[in-house]
């Protein structure tokens, strides 16, 4: 069987600024991400991050990939997210940001704009894509809600059984 090779998406232009796209999924939530050079503003469905996510763990999940790559204050993030609940949406956004960052660093390293980390043989320096993958931001969490079965109360729970 032939191996499928995924090509990195080229940047899109929003106005005069270059933007990098990423898509993330978690449970039934789907997030579409645009990373634009800026000063660190994050807007989700045209609302600020602090207004959209009230839980600190959800905010940290969204900001995690940016802080790992040390790009928190250098990129603006525009997000459109649909479906799922709040935590599922946070996971989808996190994966989408990581994928967009991977595309951004992958294209920059391939073009020679930013030298590939670890290219000069420095021990302990890891490329961004590998760093994101090792941290788990690029991995799709495939856990979904299990369907309800007939003859049962839920997916696993059975109706009460009486022997006599």
Language-model segments: residues:
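Structured, basic alpha/beta domains of bacterial-type, RNA-associated proteins
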Residues: 2-25, 31-82, 87, 91, ...
